[in-house]
């Protein structure tokens, strides 16, 4: 891809949130109250005035074991582009020259920019573009085109830094400066930033100070990459692929303002190199001056835009990349502990209980003597000796005869029931009467309030009814008559006729089999449904009930005279009732008649009103002569001038509303904070209470001393000894059966051996089986009927 060799000094402005600080910051600082201008100015001045501490003596040991995390494992485009570079013709490429060791040349470049030579466009690979971004812009007039063959990296080691110096002194000076910076860069590796690998088209002059600063970073990055081991990537086919230029991990929240890169360079950070900075390594760089957004936009609009050559870029495979969200930097870690962790902490805080060893003297102590038991005695009952009896006996002698007579008279009187009498209380003498009612009065009021029940007269029709009304009568149930099931299948499927029926149908005259009966119209046969029968029965029953009811009403209308009382002396003749007056007929008061009368009256009034109006209209009345214009011309009114009123802008009262809203939000946050603190305090109190309760329950209690008064004495068992009994196994019967079957063969073998011994007394068989054969012969002679003889 053809492009002009130019490096864009870009700064990447990203912020990284310190999770530990963000989590602990609310404990030391109130974020609700805003920061004042004095506090912000004091904080900014601290970064300029404060200095870092001296280097630690353990820096060499830290540098020896310092390692970097690789941000991007490898550049997948490098291997493909190297194969394409071999096929393409080589063209002169812009050399990469370090200007860090030549401050005088940088000044010349600023004074005489007209001497800058144009750069011939060439094909630059992504690998070369990455190296060019880490080095100085190639638009210096002292550079000369060289061949691209020197830029090719070997295939077995990481890509070395590609730098060309103008002299041996410049190389030494550059190494010295990088050595001074290596301690700080190894201490804080987050300053190593991956540069944007964008290929700029066109020539654009940049500041030499910013270029020297980038050269320092690029040279340090390459120096660190030289010391890294070779990294390989494992492929699918079992092969490995070399990873070139592994990039160290960047910690965004630890970067300094002077080393931050961005893709849009409106205000590049300018750092000033002082002799003091060259002497000390850990000196902070000065902060870039503040530039407003309006100045940045004005500078961007007035600057000359970059001219791009209309070339079609090379198509490459899209590599997936994880998006960088602002929420990932803003999110705080979850520090809420789980229930398992809380339980572990509680168990760890519980004081561990360790039981003391048992004192062996307690077990070795002698048994306590048996307590002495006293013999029980029956309780002795004592009589009551009251003082009243003694006093009565003492005063009996001194009592007079009169007192005894009076007592006798009182004893002779008949006793009566004591009538209750209400006590005379002082409260009854008060002026105000008591309002409280007695229980009798309350009961009387309840009885008066209770609804009075009056029984209705008995209906005599209940006795004449058969259970329809009044008392229910249990009707006698009839015996269920079984009925045969009538299925339609019996009619559809005819049963096979018996032989007798077929024989009866036989006749002497043969019937023609080909005769077909004439088709006839199907006669409709209505269904005989049970529901219709039940409906007819129900209607009949209903009619009968109506008839009985009418008969009862007729009987009820007939007056039934009561008989005269049976008296002989004075017969009671009922008086003749007074005759009632005849009923006078009164016409019905229908609402329709009333409405008709009102409607007729309204029509008559309407007709009368219309007649009066027409009569008034027929009357003529002359109008007066017109002296003045009935429609005068309106005079022209002088309108006042328009008063200019100011606009009622929302900006005027929006700030006040916003302040009120912020005040309400602050109050609500304080209220929530107070609620949270109260809930946490209550939770802590509850946890402490539960912990105290758990500690109370876990208090160890000593076991009581064992009682050795009744030691355990094993007694002799009453069961007898176990008698051994051989099991009735089938194996025994099976072996006996086999021996019985094998006996005839044994007898034949023994007889043969006996004959052999008699015929050959000196044989080896005779020596071996001599004893067995002799025993068999003796057995056969003693028991001629045995199986051996057979």
From Swiss-Prot:
GO terms for biological process: cell division; mitotic cell cycle; mitotic spindle assembly; regulation of mitotic spindle organization; spindle assembly. Residues 101-160, 188-211, 394-417, 701-727 are annotated as: Disordered. Its main location: nucleus. InterPro entries: TPX2_C (IPR027329), TPX2_central_dom (IPR027330), TPX2_fam (IPR009675). Pfam families: TPX2, TPX2_importin. The keyword Metal-binding does not apply. One of its GO terms (cellular component) is nucleoplasm. Keywords: Cell cycle, Cell division, Coiled coil, Cytoplasm, Cytoskeleton, Microtubule, Mitosis, Nucleus. Residues 115-124, 132-142, 188-202, 395-406, 715-725 have a biased composition (Polar residues). It is found in: Nucleus, Nucleoplasm; Cytoplasm, Cytoskeleton, Spindle; Cytoplasm, Cytoskeleton, Phragmoplast. Signal peptide: none annotated. Residues 407-417 have a biased composition (Basic and acidic residues). Disruption phenotype: Lethal when homozygous. PANTHER family: TARGETING PROTEIN FOR XKLP2. Regulates prospindle assembly during late prophase and at the onset of mitosis, before nuclear envelope breakdown (NEB). Is exported from the nucleus shortly before NEB and organized into two polar crescents. After NEB, is progressively associated with the forming spindle. Probably mediates AUR1 activation and localization to spindle microtubules. Has a microtubule binding capability and is able to trigger microtubule assembly induced by RanGTP in a heterologous system. Not involved in phragmoplast assembly, nuclear envelope reformation, and cortical microtubule assembly at the onset of G1. TPX2 over-expressing cells display formation of nuclear and perinuclear microtubular arrays which are not specific for the transition to mitosis and occur independently of AUR1 kinase. The N-terminal part of the protein is required for the interaction with AUR1. Two regions (220-463 and 684-758) seem involved in the targeting to the microtubule cytoskeleton. Interacts with AUR1. Belongs to the TPX2 family. This is Protein TPX2. It comes from Arabidopsis thaliana (Mouse-ear cress). The lineage of its organism: Eukaryota, Viridiplantae, Streptophyta, Embryophyta, Tracheophyta.
